[in-house]
Amino acid sequence: MSRIGKKPIAIPNNVKVSLDGNVLTIEGPKGKLSMPVHEIVNVKIDNNQITVSKNQESPFAQAMHGTTAALIKNTIEGVSKGYSVTLEVVGLGYKAAMKGQELELNLGYSHPIYYKPPAGIKLEVKENKITVSGIDKQLVGQVAAEIIKFRKPDPYKGKGIRYEGQVLKLKPGKSAGKGKK
């Protein structure tokens, strides 16, 4: 049995959970999310708790047991508190700004890059820091990764877009001609 799946998931007072067939709908103060539940897993709602159990004993059932429990926990946290990721734009002349609903990035290319976030994602820019926020943890992480992909951190100078607080191990530059004969 999965360690994560064994523990019952507490439902906060401000969150409503309903199960319709194989679709679990979770609604909270920040919004509403629905997620499919695999038929190999049973979800039971009672006494402000959700319990997840598996139908059969197989490695796949065990994996889905833990995964489903973790996804439900993340969804409950998302609709009650929300998720956010902060990115830093580092580099001389590298800039980020919001133009209406689109994110405009100047990253040393000959043209600016425009990024329109998907529905449910909010972008904010303050002093070359981009904050990606939303209620879906997977979507917030995916959008942050897509923005980083426009200019990954350079391994020599550290220029580019990175997660806030991310420590880069910089490579040494060329050391040709120093002491060699």
UniProtKB/Swiss-Prot annotation:
It comes from the Bacteria. One of its GO terms (molecular function) is structural constituent of ribosome. GO terms for biological process: cytoplasmic translation. GO terms for cellular component: cytosolic large ribosomal subunit. Pfam families: Ribosomal_L6 (PF00347). Disulfide bonds: none annotated. Keywords: Ribonucleoprotein, Ribosomal protein, RNA-binding, rRNA-binding. Part of the 50S ribosomal subunit. PANTHER family: 60S/50S RIBOSOMAL PROTEIN L6/L9 (PTHR11655), LARGE RIBOSOMAL SUBUNIT PROTEIN UL6M (PTHR11655:SF14). This protein binds to the 23S rRNA, and is important in its secondary structure. It is located near the subunit interface in the base of the L7/L12 stalk, and near the tRNA binding site of the peptidyltransferase center. Belongs to the universal ribosomal protein uL6 family. This is Large ribosomal subunit protein uL6. It comes from Hydrogenobaculum sp. (strain Y04AAS1). The gene is rplF.
